[in-house]
Amino acid sequence: VIVAGEPDMLKALQGKVAGVDIRSSQGGPGSATKINIRGASSFFGDNEPLIIVDGVPLSNQQITTSNQTSGGSNYSGGLSSIDPNDIASMSVLKGSAAAAMYGSRASNGVVIIKTKSGSTTSGEKRFGVTLNSSLSFENIANLPEYQNTYGPGFAFKYSNSNGSWGPRFDSMEKIPAWEDYLNAFPELFPEDGMIPYEAVPNNVKDLFQTGHIYDNSVNLSGGNEKSAFNATLSHMKHEGYIPNSGYKRVAMSVGGSTKLGNGINLRGNISYTNTDQKGGMYGENQVSGAASSFARTLFLGRNWDLTKYPYETPDGKPVSTLTSQYDNPLWSWKHNVTTTEADRIIGSIGLDYDVTDWFNISYTIGTNVYSMYRKEVIDIGSRAAEGKGQLTDHKARTVETESTLLLTFEKDFFEDYSVKAILGHNANERKRTETLVVGTEFKVPNIYNLANTKNQVVSGDYYEKRRLMGVFFDLTLGYKSWAFLGFTARNDWSSTLPKNHRSYFYPAVTGSFVFSDAFNLQSNMFNFGKIRVGWAKVGRDADPYYLYNVYALGDPFRGQTITSASSSAGNNNLKPEFTEEVEVGTQLDFFNRRLSLDFTWYNKISTNLIAPVQLPNSSGFVEIYDNFGKIRNRGIEIGLRAVPVEIKDFKWEVGVNFTKNKNEVLELKEGVERIALAGVLTDLA
């Protein structure tokens, strides 16, 4: 991850693991990155894998303030705050069989991250200092292929409008200057307010700049026979290719472990990250009164040279070629701005006790605290907010605490047989608070706080709490280190499900056979061969507050608080979702492991899905969440790795991944023909 020089640890995984789909929501600095493994298995539930950092779960949720219709910015995600410089290792568990060990939240797979501060081990006396520094540049990757023969207008007649349906550029010499520019800066147009009618081939490209990323870190590590420590400090600054966009991250972490004697080992680590993100409005904005710097940017009139002329008057008012349809992007990037400051603290402490050489007791408790403060400004003069200005003040805080107790038995019998059994208990609690206040119509220009707005409305004030408890058992039987059979079972209890369905059980069975060892097939050409099979069933709970009819507090009326019922009816008979998956695969290594092939076929079916069903108006509600539907994901994954060159101090490794996943909705509820997952003018599901 460090070698990749990518400030987002998920983006560094792009193309590295077959079956893992990684996509960025926006191209701006710090923008959220979504990860999906083997397709979507739920209509409305979270389809991202569980992220575990040093034993502590971490949500990759993207907290949005405005949607893509009204504006929308390049909001960051949960993993944007993870410092790649502190990552020691990262592994991806793709199959549902992993869920029995990690709980129902792992139904979409697991990404396990071990940091340097969280993976210290004692050993020989040592002390080390590692410095990393990188500088990289970025430019906008692609733009449409523009024509430069025809200008703006309709039916080959000139008019100041978007598109290129007007006359040829070689058919006219001059046209009237744009009204906004002529009124604001008449001195720029001395020839009777006329300008040349000519194409500007790079008028879109010239709006952008060359971005750069500075990333510096220092790592200290040391230890002796009994203790070890590790500490990392890093600073990253990303200036984007969109003007006035950027992302800063300062991260520090420290961890260590020590042997207390009598088989007891104490370990712990803590990390703190502060991020500061800034960017414009980048949303859809094809509706009236919305704010987006990209409303018309990608299909400007071919003669609109926005970088040649000022984009604002001396008092800050916008100037553009067609004010009624779009904000000048250069003005918008300066004035319509979203700034987000966030802090994340992840800490864990654990105790390991080797009772005997074959029995170990381990307990880990950790917490993850995330706090965010965001200001979203639509400045005076924008076509949005009626031109009067708007400020959205958004605060959010999430606290997640998890504890895990493991009893591990591991012993060999009669030289050829091995047994490993894990009995565990897991407890998880998540709390979230969120407030969102919108102030409209600035009293005084250039002062961006709620006290400077004439009207304030609390558009959101949320509190959410949920708990998930589980017990699990994992048994692995081995024979001669080439045949393995595994059994896993877990039972969870979720606070988001009704009492009669709160408890749900799910098992898994896996097997693997290393035939190259069993039949002694190793040679210079063929080194390793393994076949693996697995079946798993995993349950998943609902989001909070689907069970009962709940009420919300509205705006006061004549001093009295107004309470209104939710548009969703409660359903006290909700059941968990279930996913069954069958997986078959093989791993083959050739030519002293310089060529390897990994192939997997899987078939995953999800049932009992939790989704809304429309209700008749006479019910007094709009919808109710219920269990219905069936989704199938079926596909193959191929990973090919080769080492063309390997000498003493040099190794060149190349890899190719291929994934094919077919995602099908097999069933809906009787009488339900379609479910709207997203619309043209709404966020993508």
Could you tell me what each predicted segment is?
Residues V1-S253, T258-R267, T273, I346-G347, ...:
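Short, small/polar-rich motifs associated with maturation and membrane association
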Residues L13, A18, P186, R296, ...:
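Proline-centered flexible-loop/turn and helix-kink motifs
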